[in-house]
Amino acid sequence: RPVGIQIFGANLDSMLKAVDIVEKTNPDIIDINFGCPVKKVVSKGAGAGILKDLDLMESLTKAIVKRTKLPVTVKTRLGWDENTIKIVEVAERLQDVGCKAISIHGRTRAQMYKGEADWTYIEKVKNNPRMEIPVFANGDINTPERALKIKNLGLDGAMIGRASIGNPWFFNEVKHFLKTKTHLKP
């Protein structure tokens, strides 16, 4: 523990049904994925597709927060594309409707996984005087040194994704490095 279960969608009724089902499994957290860039998900307006409709993102989050007693967190991206980066506003709106933490992938949906994640926007969210909830970085945290950089930026933590695929011991490597500044021996 803690155990979090992630849900995604763009339809209020479906999302609320998902919350009801998830609650029966007794998790500690419900996380909403507003960051998945996969075409199959986005084409339904879900995942990062919701970044085209911030009012819907806000209203879904508000309804889910109201529906459950569990803490609700959100994972999202900087924006739909480079012309719609509104992550500071998004974070404020999510916090205002009861979101308890936000994880931000440092790319837009248009970037998918190309280029390098831009953590400066995530740092802007964290340094926003209005922000009171934890802010986590996601994207390109693929070495222990990069995890340390997240810590040194003053962010509340890192959400590691692709770096752990096929490398589940990566979490231990990061934890050890953050504690000792040395790498685990192979």
How would you name each of these model-derived features?
Residues 1-186:
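Flavin-dependent oxidoreductase catalytic cores
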